[in-house]
Amino acid sequence: VNPFAAALEDPDRLHTRASDRLKMMHDASHYALLPQAVAEPVDAAEVGRLFAVSAAHGIPMTFRSGGTSLSGQAGTDGILVDTRRHFRSIDVLDDGLRVRAGPGATVRAVNARLARHGRKLGPDPASEIACTLGARVSNTPAGLRC
């Protein structure tokens, strides 16, 4: 059994077939790195177990949400951890002064929730429909009106 599959409650969420790995080897950049596997954790506990396996086996992990990076940050030849599907929560707090969102929530979805409070995230990447908060935090994109 693949130790990364054992870190997930449902081992079917570790994708090792060539077709699954090939479709995730590109982000929006020209770089192409074929991951060893693609993991789809559903919660922080599974992410923690993936980190433990990664450290124990010396296999690097890279997180991917929207795959909109123009610089190759969403690619790896290690384990690719896809947060797009299961980490989309958005909680607007304090009348829009704060927002708590998962790394898979898109900038557009967060801004739609904040608009009800007369607020939005800035700056604004052109890829807001696909760009996620995980990328915004980890890759510091500037956007069109910076």
Where do the model's predicted regions map?
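Conserved phosphate-binding and hydrolysis motifs of nucleotide-dependent enzymes
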Residues: D43, G104, A135
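Short beta-strand-to-turn element immediately C-terminal to the catalytic PLP-Schiff-base lysine
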Residues: Q73, D82, G102, S138-T140
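N-terminal flexible segment immediately upstream of the FAD-binding catalytic core
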Residues: V1-A56, G66-L97, A126
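Structural motif
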Residues: R64-G66, G102, D124
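Residue-level detector of anion-binding/catalytic polar loops
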Residues: G58-P60, K120
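A gly/ser-rich beta-alpha-beta helix-loop segment of oxidoreductase catalytic cores
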Residues: L70, R108-C146
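Short, structural beta-strand-to-alpha-helix junction motif
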Residues: H86, L97-R98, A105-V110, T132-L133
